[in-house]
Amino acid sequence: MSPNPLQKPAIDAAPAPFADFAPPVRPQSTLRRAITAAYRRPETECLPPLVEAATQSKEIRDAAASTARKLIEALRGKHSGSGVEGLVQEYSLSSQEGVALMCLAERPVRIPDTATRDALIRDKIADGNWKSHLGRSRSLFVNAATWGLVVTGKLTSTVNDRTLAARVTRLISRCGEPVIRRGVDMAMRMMGEQFVTGETIEALKRSKELEEKGFSYSYDMLRERPTAADAERYYRDYESAIHATAKPRGRGIYEGPGISIKLSALHPRYRQAARVMGELLPRVKALALLAKNYDIGLNIDAEEADRLELSLDLLEVLCLDGDLSGWNGMGFVVQAYGKRCPFVLDFIIDLARRSGRRIMVRLVKGAYWDAEIKRAQLDGLADFPVFTRKIHTDVSYMPRTQAACRDRCGVPQFATHNAQTLAAIYHMAGKDFHVGKYEFQCLHGMGEPLYEEVVGRGKLDRPCRIYAPVGTHETLLAYLVRRLLENGANSSFVHRINDPKVSIDELIADPVEVVRAMPVVGAKHDRIALPAVLFGDARTNSAGFDLSNEETLASLTEALRESAAMKWTALPQFATGPAAGETRTVLNPGDHRDVVGSVTETRKRTHGAPCACRRRGAGLGGRLAERAACLDRAAELMQARMPTLLGLIIREAGKSALNAIAEVREAIDFLRYYAEQTRRTLGPATPLGPIVCISPWNFPLAIFTGQIAAALVAGNPVLAKPAEETPLIAAEGVRILREAGIPASALQLLPGDGRVGAALVAGRDAGVMFTGSTEVARLIQAQLADRLSPAGRPVPLIAETGGQNAMIVDSSALAGQVVGDVITSAFDSAGQRCSALRVLCLQEDVAGPHPDDAEGRAARHCISAAPIVFSVDVGPVITSEAKDNIEKHIERMRGLGRKVEQIGLASETGVGTFVPPTIIELEKLSDLQREVFGPVLHVIRYRRDDLDRLVDDVNATGYGLTFGLHTRLDETIAHVTSRIKAGNLYINRNIIGAVVGVQPFGGRGLSGTGPKAGGPLYLGRLVTTAPVPPQHSSVHTDPVLLDFAKWLDGKGARAEVEAARNAGSSSALGLDLELPGPVGERNLYTLHARGRILLVPATESGLYHQLAAALATGNSVAIDAASGLQASLKNLPQTVGLRVSWSKDWAADGPFAGALVEGDAERIRAVNKAIAALPGPLLLVQAASSGEIARNPDAYCLNWLVEEVSASINTAAAGGNASLMAIG
């Protein structure tokens, strides 16, 4: 037995695993427990009590309706949509122009180079029908913006030269790029000024006009996701803002201006409780003390749902701090769309009483609605933290109004642009009013027209504070897009109030009565799927854990500790029972003092034991439905035991808690997906026979389970060889599968090192499934090439290997989003994913002098440690050997003079195998000799004009697994994705975490043979005759095939003509499906031509069949010149001839994308060995005898001649999900 690199002498006694996994920040009170319990409560449970609590007397309802009607009539009467109201009315998100406007608003002034800026303008404007909007609004602002877009659209669109006007337009277009650029810039800045008060906090003079009318202000230095340096700078900005805001002293908290701060802008890791309380709390206290000194208000702004309770922890500490006593200026924003809203308000009022102060409570409808929906669906959580209907939020807004106005401990600040809500609050609060009792709030640039009817004598005489963003257009355009999204939605009040088709009666309807009249009070929106039913009736989505829930964390921590106390073992499991062997311990790679369990490895003399079992051991057997049911039962068992499995994965594989959860979920998804696919598509297919499954250590349960599940449900017996490093979780997976009904004869486990795998591959099995390195896959291919399956064909090999995965980022991309996606893609799982980002390609205009600065700053805040603590970001690499190989590469790069940036490692990492997140600047892509499997990101810069050359360089690596692109240019997306040769494409998002059935996973070239795991073709590779892929309107017959069939018909080759036509009707070339998935994404699955196919025919008829199969799938061919069949293809149609070449030297003429062989067993074996020896990608070889070709029209499976491509597009990248916002 080879030495185990994980085994080292014990140092000190290891601490008890998970003893400090997620200690509570503060003990939970009864009120805090109520908040936690309501986090994801079903809407049908939330709404009935809210409806009752919000129900008002008929007198108040009638008075509110009358006031709301007067407000709306006044608004509609004095103007028709001036400012932003008119803009969002004219350009709704249901129009192409509205979406283009949103995209334009976000990016142009941020783009540093004029070429990309001009390209964005052309991309977004040229196709819009801007002229149709001209003059439809009476607003000067709307028409000014429209005129600019009309002119720009004319200058950028394609023109017809036959008219004089077209020639003039073309002349202006050729000469006028600066004019176009300046016009769009002006239009976007004009829009920005509608929302942004000023560029600096000192620019407060714009506020004076409305202050004189009785308005007050709360200023917010809006900031994006920060690095540590950004957070420090933002803190200084907030300090300066407080000083500047307080200059006009003496007006007090309620009548003077205030400041809003965003906690996530002040700390780069505002989700990790321990760090936040230790590092952020002192900063916030310092700002609060400064605000207290000036006697102004300081509001803590809203965050995403998973940060709420952490924000409440900070608020509680601040309010109970003696240094801040006597100051009533602390404020907190509560979002009514959250199901916890009523309980948060109860907690804040109680906190005010306990601390002896008044706390300002800004009640808003909510700011992250679409993102919360998507997050819950992605994470497989029990329910949403927010309501799915906007009218439910309107109801949630009301119940605490009267109580809040009566309770002197709180100062309600009602932030709304809805006239009905405003009127209801006005009458519910009563006529007894004094300054400081309550106030209204609105957003700068949006609510002033409404509140001009509220503020001052002769109006409703209630105060309104304007929430006013401050900053440059460059920093605040994301905020602008968000406002356009929220208010451009057809369901928003701002949009509807300016729509003459919406009656005033509709606008003033009491939401409480509307909800009460619904068939089911609190029924969720029927167009928003709960996470569990994301895939409809086909299958249940796997469930995750909500790690922002204190109760969940507490129960998970207990389960992890119980898991650590279990005795984990792995034994060889044959059909006849467990086998003996040499036993060794398995150590935690993050802490070698922690003994996870023990494994008994398969002895050499028992390698042959499974062979006997193969002969008498059947597959899973039974009907398809029974086999699928076994997988479903296994999925349920795995789901129920997830906490226990997590503890084992974390300790054995060194995964973080989040990664371990994703691992188990993926395994469950594989089980359910293959069960569903079996029922739907497999039919009465014949299994291949015994399958050897060799799985990797980096996904020791998910890939292990996926391989086995697919092979078993197709009816094949399985010999499972887990990775040497992770046998324990594999053994537990086998126990679960057997408990679910898989017989021992159908599933055997053989733990051990590479020699066990080699012995299994050398056996007489019918197929091999392998995930691992390209080098090992080549060895397996060469070993299999020397023999044939019982049917006389090449032994099927499904290999999924590594990748030199790249991401291209152009200057139109949003830097903050890019940094987050890059860090996740490169360093999640310590870079030990085959999909991980290895090379970041930055356009030089955006990269600056040091392109890795932003990523480097962010990387410094990744915590590397043993992941038995929840806050760990980056765990260990798997073995000492892996660590040594990575460090050698880093040193080689240093030796070449490349710039290397690394974060330091904490001293406690010395007990494990850790490599710090590392960023290396390269001069060219060819500096990389091979894939570096660890937390190492390489960065190169490129010129915009060299984009095509860069894509060619990426393709030239020969790998083709994952690829990422960050750009706002649709034209660039279409161009790059059409040229890149990769199996999984990711647009404006990270490039990891493919979801089963949503982003089928697998590469091409050096990255694998296909078919894609978790995709519709996978099971077909495990039976003798694959089912025909789903037909779709996108599928088309290649016209070149039709030309070939016509040519064959002219030769009188009737059988071959029929074969060609049959191939055309069976081919799925061009298939383009949108797969089900979470909101905010489009997930496309397409089938393309595979490339150039090597044909090795023995007869003329065989050649015609091979060529027909290749052409039916859109491919070109290289025909073996040694076949001597050149005369058989004389006088081919030109279209066909362009696809055909002859090859005398396969090595020189390659690489090829596949091979079709004709011949007897001896010839097939000889050709197969020759192909296995070729350099380049792993080729999928299909072979058949001449007799079989004549008898069987499906002798060559067309599925293996097409290339599967999965593309995942973040449709919310521009700031939000337009389609989802429109339905709320």
Curated annotation (Swiss-Prot):
SUPFAM superfamilies hit by this protein: ALDH-like, FAD-linked oxidoreductase, N-terminal domain of bifunctional PutA protein
Pathway listed: Amino-acid degradation; L-proline degradation into L-glutamate; L-glutamate from L-proline: step 1/2; Amino-acid degradation; L-proline degradation into L-glutamate; L-glutamate from L-proline: step 2/2
MF terms in GO: 1-pyrroline-5-carboxylate dehydrogenase activity; DNA binding; DNA-binding transcription factor activity; proline dehydrogenase activity
Keyword tags: DNA-binding, FAD, Flavoprotein, Multifunctional enzyme, NAD, Oxidoreductase, Proline metabolism, Repressor, Transcription, Transcription regulation
Catalytic residues, chain numbering: E800, C834
Region Disordered, residue ranges: 1-25
Protein name listed in UniProt: Bifunctional protein PutA
Aldehyde dehydrogenase, as annotated region: 576-1032
Catalytic reaction(s) noted: L-proline + a quinone = (S)-1-pyrroline-5-carboxylate + a quinol + H(+); L-glutamate 5-semialdehyde + NAD(+) + H2O = L-glutamate + NADH + 2 H(+)
Classification via NCBIfam families: D1pyr5carbox3, PRK11904.1
Pfam families per UniProt: Aldedh, Pro_dh, Pro_dh-DNA_bdg, PRODH
Job of this protein: Oxidizes proline to glutamate for use as a carbon and nitrogen source, and also functions as a transcriptional repressor of its own gene.
